Amino acid sequence: MVFDYKFFNQRDDGVHCRGCTNITIQDCEFYTGDDCIAGCANVNVLVTDCVFNTACSGMRFGGTNILVRNSKFYGPAKFFFRGSLSKEEKRDGAQAHRPHRVNMLSAFTYLADFSVPILEEPGNIIIKDCTIDNVDRFLCYNFSGNAHWQTCKPLASIKFENIEAKDIELPLTAYGSAELPVDLALKHVNVAFREDVEAVDFLHLVHYGNVRLDDVHVTAKGKLHLVKYWTQGDIILNNVTCSAPENEWIVAAEEEFYCKAI
């Protein structure tokens, strides 16, 4: 299945695939009122040279062997969020107007629900050579149980490489499963939080196995922690800088994180 040189303008989900194998999405531009690319239980997926602009998630996606590369994620959205419109309004092509929001919630949000069987273990998701600009967060993996789109099967591993991210507002969330802790890798990643953010954590970690940061640089004007964790796992730092005192880089959470479903 190949989508190439497509222009998605003011739709719900731009592309939605479930239970598919060997998908290529290339040279596409997404300007959507819902997720740009969505779906779960997909295997062998390539997304390359695309533009993502939405009031929801750039990708709300799950599967095995997924590569996203050479793409741009940015907000605010061209169109207002369409998720609050009724089915009739969506069917009739109604436009979302104020006070619907235009902030982009996440570059990548994990998806694994019960709509189709998930036959292979989700994991080996790689996002590389991308820019992320004015997006609330660049990962939302929330297997805490309150996000019904992320309750079927947990994610085994995800990696970000060669990422330039700026004007980020919220932590990168990796809330895995106790039965299958998530492995997270970040390599050659630069992150700058929005200047008006008074206090923020770069990573929120729960039920993680191995978290590795190589050549990662994080800056914020306000108070910053590099990692805040609730459960124990392995955290490896190599050539990392952070605009916070080093003794405040990695701290334990005082209570379990509440992850808002998005």
Where are these regions (language model features)?
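Extracellular/periplasmic carbohydrate-active domains that bind, remodel
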Residues: M1-I262
